[in-house]
Regions:
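Mobile active-site "lid"/loop adjacent to the S-adenosyl-L-methionine
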Residues: 80-111
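Conserved Class I SAM-dependent methyltransferase catalytic core
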Residues: 40, 102-163, 172-176
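Glycine-rich, phosphate-binding/catalytic loops in enzymes
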Residues: 33-34, 54-55, 92-96, 142-145
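Charged, non-catalytic accessory extensions
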Residues: 274-276
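Conserved S-adenosyl-L-methionine
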Residues: 1-85, 129-132, 175
Length: 276
């Protein structure tokens, strides 16, 4: 993704990583004029500040971002945290929108809605996130909210063994959305994104992946997720070698699609985009 953002025609002016760690997502974005990062761990945040002194590093949780930054960023992108960690955000807690209020109960849901708030119209949100966002029945309201406030550009399911070097095997998705609060109808792709279906043994999978399309894998099996619940396990042999080629071509094709909508123009049209 970082390579795609270096293409001159699509280089963003304002980039936000709401869960930056030590800066994996911003490591190649030196030519982006304005980069903001959030990292709540104090030690990691200090390392991040030292590595990227020209970036605006906030050593605090994403929920502390100021209202000034609503509608501000061109791109919001990160490998976001997941789990049932409750977040406190006064504006969300007092909201009349039930999806906003309920998103506070799960950090990954909150990051999607809060990230969307910080984007300008036509801006891009690209998150690596737990597969529970797309597969969980409980998250249907969140998925519906997202595609009613943004165009679904694309999704891709990553292999469970992608992050074994970090000591974890977890199902994850790359979800890409383009903010569009003026849309009046959903595409078939977006309706599929909202719904799930049962495969077997109470295993739910998002309708976007019903034919196992857009899933990076060489093998699939019935097993369990990291919480011990029944799940489909997708793995890829030699994951460290082919994935950069796959993701590189995927991102270049996706950004090419966005370019046709003049994404970087401040008053861009926001058409529905086909899957890459």
């Amino acid at each position: 993704m970082q390579e795609a953002l270096l293409i001159p025609e699509i280089r963003p002016e304002r980039f936000l990583d709401p869960s930056a760690g030590t800066g994996m997502f911003i490591s190649t974005l030196k030519d982006v004029p304005e980069i903001h990062c959030f990292e709540k761990d104090r030690l990691t945040g200090r390392i991040l500040s030292s590595l990227y002194p020209k970036s605006k590093v906030n050593i605090e949780g994403f929920q502390s971002i100021q209202p000034y930054y609503n509608g501000y960023f061109d791109v919001v992108s990160s490998n976001i945290p997941f789990g049932n960690t409750r977040i406190y955000d006064r504006d969300f807690d007092r909201s009349d929108d039930p999806v906003r209020k309920s998103s506070l109960a799960a950090v990954h849901n909150y990051f999607f809605l809060k990230g969307m708030d910080t984007l300008r119209e036509g801006g891009i949100l690209a998150y690596i996130t737990t597969s529970g966002i797309m597969d969980s029945l409980q998250n249907r309201p969140v998925r519906e909210w997202l595609v009613n406030h943004a165009n679904l550009v694309s999704t891709i399911r990553l292999p469970d063994n992608l992050f074994t070097d970090a000591g974890t095997e977890v199902g994850s998705d790359l979800i890409v959305l383009q903010k569009n609060t003026r849309k009046s109808e959903l595409t078939e792709k977006e309706r599929n994104f909202i719904e799930t279906r049962i495969i077997s043994d109470s295993i739910h999978i998002n309708n976007s992946y019903a034919g196992l399309d857009h899933i990076v894998h060489t093998s699939v099996s019935m097993g369990k997720n990291m919480y011990g619940q029944p799940a489909m396990n997708f793995t890829m042999k030699g994951v460290s070698e082919p994935l950069p080629n796959i993701s590189g071509s995927y991102w270049h094709k996706m950004w090419g699609t966005i370019l046709t909508g003049n994404f970087m123009k401040k008053t861009c049209p926001v058409p529905p985009f086909p899957l890459p």
